[in-house]
Amino acid sequence: MDYRLAPEFKFPTPLNDFFTAFRYIYENASRFGVDQNRVAVGGDSAGANIAAATCLMAKQLPEIKVSHQLLFYPALDATMSSKSHHQYAEGYGLDSSTMVYCWDQYVQDESEKHNGLVSPLLAQSLEGLPDATIFVCEYDPVREDGERYAQRLQEAGIHTKLHFLEGMIHGAIHMTAITSEATTIYSKIAL
C-alpha cells in the first residue's frame, strides 16, 4: 500500500494512512473476496516498522484482528540502541548516517523516538499481537531490531518464526537478480 512519506508527512501520518487502508480492507474483506480471518500485514525496513506499529494499533480495537505480521529486516528502534547499529554502521549498504537521517525525518522531535508506535521494539507490551514471521540479514544495522522483537514476541507467548539470512545485507528481498540466496526468501514465505 502506498502511504504518505516523510519528510513531507511526519509521524503519525504514514502510520495512520496505512492503518486506515488496512482497516478498510479488513472491514470490507468480503467485498474483495478475502477471508477476514486471514488479513495480514507486512513490509520491509520502514514498511515493516509501519506493519508492526499497525499491529500495536489494532490490538487496541477488539473489532479488528490482524492475522499475521510478516516483517523483512524491520527497523523497529528509532533510538538505534542495538549493537548491530554500530557493528554494521558503514560498508554494508544501509549506513548509520542514513538511518539517523531517516529517523529524524520521520519524527517531529527526539522524544517521539521512544513512542512504541514509532519504535515498536520499545512498546511497553507486545502481548496480544499476531503471530509473526521475521527475516533478518546478517550484515544489517537493524538485524538486532528484528531479533530482539522476535524474542520479545516469544516471551509474550506469540508464535514467532525468525529467519536469519546468512551473508545478506539490508534490502535482500530486492536482490533476486544479484544473488540466488535472495530467491530462497520467497520460498520460505510460502511455507
Role assignments for model-derived ranges:
Residues 1-191:
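Alpha/beta-hydrolase superfamily serine-hydrolase fold, recognizing
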